[in-house]
Amino acid sequence: IAPAGEMAATAAETIIGSVAHALQSEADDERPIISGELPIGGHRFEGLLPPVVASPTFTIRRRASRLLPLDDYIADKVMTEAQATVIRSAIANRLNIVIAGGTGSGKTTLANAVIAEIIASAPDDRMVILEDTAEIRCAAENAVCLHTSDTIDMARLLKSTMRLRPDRIIVGEVRDGAALTLLKAWNTGHPGGVTTV
């Protein structure tokens, strides 16, 4: 990551407060963490205020500008043809796919490529997509997107998903206790899903 420059703490706090307001939330000592999607561009925002940090800080993570299909991964030598074949076979056999990696490693970009392959091979499947921040790109005609909020967590969305008759459950990023709920959903008649960890 290249240095982005310097900013006065008061300016950073003002930006975090403005983003919180745009997200219909508050940023203060009692609610010092703001996470969400910027209203313009849909980029991810994470802002932190004291007391969880010494000085106000925030990060903006840009969305990928375009969808990278699996064939581009092969052409760019990011993955081999054999690896792409394994992914395509997993999709065809309705196996669940878990994509793991560090922050900024391209998990969501790869998940979007996998989802595009699912749509190409099973265009009639009903996709239910759950996310904290809208990052999944899904061109399926029969897709329902659910988002967490301050009062609705991922585990609650997963429970609701079971009543939406999904063919495939896709979770943008699963963590904590929601992972067990997702595994139970996948193992009770909803195979062929995708998630990142």
Regions found by a protein language model. Name each.
Residues A84, R94-A100, T109, A113-V197:
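Switch/coupling sub-region of P-loop NTPases
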